[in-house]
Amino acid sequence: MDITVAIDAMGGDHGPHVTIPAALNAIRQDSQLNIILVGVKDVIEAELSANKATVGPRLRIHHATEVVAMDESPQSALKNKKDSSMRVAINLVKSGEATACVSAGNTGALMATARFVLKTLPGIDRPAIAGILPTQKGRVYMLDLGANADCTPEHLLQFAIMGAMLVSCVEHKERPSVGLLNIGSEDIKGNEVVKQAGELLRASRLNFYGNIEGNDIYKGTTDVVVCDGFVGNVALKTSEGLAQMVNRFLVQEFKRSWMTKLMALISMPVLKAFKRRLDPRRYNGATFLGLRGVVVKSHGGADSLAFQYAIQAAAEESRNGVLNRITEQLEIEHLKPQPAAQGVENI
């Protein structure tokens, strides 16, 4: 199935130096992938030339005159950057010219712009950011990772539905398990929002595992972990910090003496395999679930390999009909939008 992905070629810390090599590698590996590079035409053409590439049937340029800065406010991006590479890429999804959009740009601006242009699916009050984390059993999808600091029980139910349908489509699991992140596994634990969300999830048609604790995330206890954006973002950043610390400790210990250096040399194949399993680039690409279009956010500091994974994630979501599955499940659950809680669009 042919898929067309619009790429914000100017977004992120490194812009076209990362996005264009990633796009070229992505279309080489996926014969059914088409890419639209959105941004300043002269800059994109120069980067293509540097990579000994040109436009063609599967790769074309869509000119945009403006760029959203990484520190620009969502309000400024919406009001003052109507011809930004970010917004034009999202507009291509709205018009149907592209089936998905990928950007490494400013998260707040991307969420606000995507919400403004694409709107939310019927039954979804507010989009959520879903990301992938490695586990002992494979990987887990976690949401929300920062879009909604405060949530109602109904919002958490919506997140669970979206996350479950994403996993069902992309991982080809018929009934993925859903866990509600809490301070204990017992039903009586947690604040009122989490308790009420648990009741809604138990009454839903989802495969609800129950409450899970932080240590369950990396055990792979469930396929989906649901929480509000405040908790999710703290958990994510804590995990990133821990991974960096472990990596630094390993390097320090192996450099301690000639004997430890020799041990490091002997252990190199194992260490490489270990590093690959935990390589954050393999899990790059957070999905903005709940919109009337596929939007994937790459880490701003991503290199070309990491950005390529984000492109692949967007293509897989489009190819496997994630939006249709979410819409169908929302209708089954008879959900209606609830009052919005504070999120990135209200910042």
From Swiss-Prot:
Its main location: cytoplasm. Coiled coil: none annotated. One of its GO terms (molecular function) is phosphate:acyl-[acyl carrier protein] acyltransferase activity. GO terms for biological process: fatty acid biosynthetic process; phospholipid biosynthetic process. InterPro entries: FA_synthesis (IPR003664), Phospholipid_synth_PlsX-like (IPR012281). Keywords: Cytoplasm, Lipid biosynthesis, Lipid metabolism, Phospholipid biosynthesis, Phospholipid metabolism, Transferase. Its EC number is 2.3.1.274. The keyword 4Fe-4S does not apply. The keyword Cell inner membrane does not apply. It is found in: Cytoplasm. It catalyses: a fatty acyl-[ACP] + phosphate = an acyl phosphate + holo-[ACP]. It comes from the Bacteria. Pathway: Lipid metabolism; phospholipid metabolism. GO terms for cellular component: cytoplasm. Homodimer. Probably interacts with PlsY. PANTHER family: FATTY ACID/PHOSPHOLIPID SYNTHESIS PROTEIN PLSX, PHOSPHATE ACYLTRANSFERASE. Belongs to the PlsX family. Catalyzes the reversible formation of acyl-phosphate (acyl-PO(4)) from acyl-[acyl-carrier-protein] (acyl-ACP). This enzyme utilizes acyl-ACP as fatty acyl donor, but not acyl-CoA. This is Phosphate acyltransferase. The gene is plsX.
